Amino acid sequence: MAKGKYAANILKQTRKNARWKDTSYGRRVLGLNVKADPLGGAPQGRGIVLEKVGVEAKQPNSAIRKCVRIQLIKNGRQVTAFCPGDGAVNFIDEHDEVTVERIGGRMGGAMGDIPGVRFRVTAVNNVSLNQMVIGRLEKPRR
């Protein structure tokens, strides 16, 4: 390492080069996390329901978690989204428009015992899924 009176430029350049050894720095600067994200960095996304699927819970739990396979409108990517609430999947039909958000797992991954599911449904045809499950709102007729 340079230590002299006029060493600032060399020190700056060395720091700049060394930062690229940090993987999180490289991914952030190159925008790789946003590029790999189906929602493209947005907090929520809209999509069309393709099918209803049941995902088996991981051990030691034994359940079939009700999910839907959706195609995002903004980029055409397909993702699986969890339907939270008792009987929530009954309010969702194929070709409905749903709003999804991240499920909140660590490092952007899956949460709890639902493997490979990184999103959850929040609204169906612009009506809150939670309100429909409670019974406060009805699903709008199209």
Swiss-Prot record:
InterPro entries in UniProt: NA-bd_OB-fold, Ribosomal_uS12, Ribosomal_uS12_arc, Ribosomal_uS12_euk/arc
Key words, A-Z: Ribonucleoprotein, Ribosomal protein, RNA-binding, rRNA-binding
Pfam families: Ribosom_S12_S23
BP-aspect Gene Ontology terms: translation
Record carries keyword Cell wall biogenesis/degradation: no
GO MF terms, alphabetically ordered: rRNA binding; structural constituent of ribosome
Coiled coil location: none
GO cellular component: small ribosomal subunit
Function in brief: With S4 and S5 plays an important role in translational accuracy. Located at the interface of the 30S and 50S subunits.
HAMAP family: Ribosomal_uS12_A
Record's subunit section: Part of the 30S ribosomal subunit.
Family: Belongs to the universal ribosomal protein uS12 family.
NCBIfam families named among the record's database cross-references: PRK04211.1, uS12_E_A
Protein name: Small ribosomal subunit protein uS12
Species this protein is from: Methanosarcina barkeri (strain Fusaro / DSM 804)
